[in-house]
Amino acid sequence: MKRFNVSYVEVIKNGETISSCFQPFQKNENYGTITSANEQITPVIFHNLIMDMVLPKVVPIKGNKVTKMSMNLIDGFDCFYSTDDHDPKTVYVCFTLVDMPKILPIRILSGLQEYESNATNELLSSHVGQILDSFHEELVEYRNQTLNSSGNGQSSNGNGQNTISDIGDATEDQIKDVIQIMNDNIDKFLERQERVSLLVDKTSQLNSSSNKFRRKAVNIKEIMWWQKVKNITLLTFTIILFVSAAFMFFYLW
């Protein structure tokens, strides 16, 4: 059975990469295609895209949320990111081929945050592998349950009964259909999630602008108050000087 994988995972803290994991591409005719252009994609390309295009758009959201980038960063790939619920300055980014199950990057990005540390490439690769193994085991279990319930392993006897091979092919097709439906639903959810992220970002920007305006208004008010005090003081001294001069003039006269 096909083993699904992710293409690239990177962990960033305070704007610096602390670990990364790259999975070389493998051709498989059953689940999507790998083009020659895909095969030329390197970890450096993924890393540069993350630094230049992903991090500037990251909006920390509480609750271990995963966001899908709606912008097409690179043909044939989807990009997902999540911020650490306990440390918003830690960002997890994952690239997958577009035909991979969308639940997979969600499982990866959420699962990585449950580990105590992903501080080295070896640790990150090990943790990603464990999550992928768990996902693969679930698919195998689902396939076996479907096979057992679809004819109980009947073989062909010439009377139109399904062979084990036919049942296996039907099961594979069913898994593909389930994955496609799941992808469509998750895509809709993640699109809403990105809109929420953008709304949070805009709200944060508005709050920041409001605070800056409020501080400027207070500063201007203080400047105007001091200017008023200076004007009153100057006017007072002018009046005193004028009165003193007038008094001396009349006194000497």
Swiss-Prot record:
Residues 147-166 are annotated as: Disordered. It is a single-pass type IV membrane protein. It comes from the Eukaryota. The chain crosses the membrane at residues 232-252. Residues 167-227 form the v-SNARE coiled-coil homology domain. PANTHER family: SYNAPTOBREVIN FAMILY MEMBER. Present with 1885 molecules/cell in log phase SD medium. This is Vacuolar v-SNARE NYV1.
